[in-house]
Amino acid sequence: GEYCGESCYLIPCFTPGCYCVSRQCVNKN
């Protein structure tokens, strides 16, 4: 659940293991 330091509005998350939640990239923690 930690923020990955990138947004994902209209673009994917680049950081491995991170996914898009509410327009920001978070990891599974």
From Swiss-Prot:
Post-translational note: This is a cyclic peptide.
GO biological process, one term: defense response
Position of the Cyclopeptide (Gly-Asn) cross-link: G1-N29
Disulfide bonds: C4-C18, C8-C20, C13-C25
Keywords: Disulfide bond, Knottin, Plant defense
InterPro entries from the UniProt entry: Cyclotide, Cyclotide_sf
Comment block on domains: The presence of a 'disulfide through disulfide knot' structurally defines this protein as a knottin.
Function noted in UniProt: Probably participates in a plant defense mechanism. Has no activity against bacteria up to a concentration of 80 uM. Has cytotoxic but no hemolytic activity.
Protein family: Belongs to the cyclotide family. Bracelet subfamily.
Descriptive protein name: Chassatide C10
